[in-house]
């Protein structure tokens, strides 16, 4: 029998994930660049602005577990397509709020942003689910790092572009610019297919080109027919030491991202006296370093794995080293020059990005029956920082009147992330659920190479 020709379909899939994630984060970052103007125009204090910044996070967190359940119930393609369509629609609708009075416009803006948060909820669990299906273990770190690094690419683009547009002058143009690309990507998604089973020969070639790989068939589960995963599965994840360590680590890692997406541009304008245009450009520089660090972290992890190191060593080494490097942000408390603040912020963001391998770890550990739900639970913990970080910083500034203390909060936060992976997570393995009603989680597609499993 002729050997199927090796394909590169998975790289096209990865490109699609990168583009979707870029659009996802571009929408999240749009409001922060105008934060200083919003605060001035509406007479808001720091605490109130912090709550406004966290509004998206409330909806996003609330939607994680339902979004993950939908992925497991209906599959990646349908839910992913519906998510992109819905959040792009609500983003486009924000362009029309200028037709209303100020009070009504503000209410509508945040209602629409709330809906965008709900609609975007399945995106990252969907990404992790797709990566687990298409990429072998020894490529999964790089693949996860690439789609995750899209957040830095998006932030760099938004900071530079939105520095040219004031929120109260060009809101319609801005949201239309961010909403339309989502529908373009959606068209390609619907035309294609995220499931490997559509091309059996191509799937076999992908498997054969993935030595010791552990591709995981996430679409073939009887849980779909049984009405979705049981809540007992969530209890098993929440009582698993490894998973709780991963969740805690992700919360700490994400905190710096949300500081950068919310308060950093405001800091540059109010404390450093920069114009919105200059702040938008300057704030994009750490994002470039974050993008490079994100990709590098995945490459380092997969290189360690290919050289014979265990999965635990390969994933934990970049995470811990990256968290240590990110603590360099504390130096910003003791320098005055703008360029030094930006340089140390860039260094910290570079380190944080190297260590942002949480989604690779989730792809390595999630039970195949509830891969979407597991990713949603992971993202729920991670994005609790999107709610708490802006609010906590607002209270720090209001209570102390010294905004530099915002830099100090990241040292214990990232210390906890490193400690969590070193002492709580333990050995990284794919977990196996108790009380599964369909075939065991280790059942493979023909030719599939099995991941390591362990009981919860």
Curated annotation (Swiss-Prot):
Q: How does it sit in the membrane?
A: Multi-pass membrane protein
Q: Which domain of life is it from?
A: Bacteria
Give me the segments passing through the membrane. 11-31, 51-71, 78-96, 102-119, 246-266, 280-300, 317-337, 341-361, 381-401, 408-428
Gene Ontology terms, MF aspect: transmembrane transporter activity
Record's Gene3D superfamilies? MFS general substrate transporter like domains (1.20.1250.20)
By its UniProt entry, which NCBIfam families does this protein fall under? Answer: 2A0114
Q: Know the name of this protein?
A: Probable galactarate/D-glucarate transporter GudP
Q: From what organism does this protein derive?
A: Pseudomonas putida (Arthrobacter siderocapsulatus)
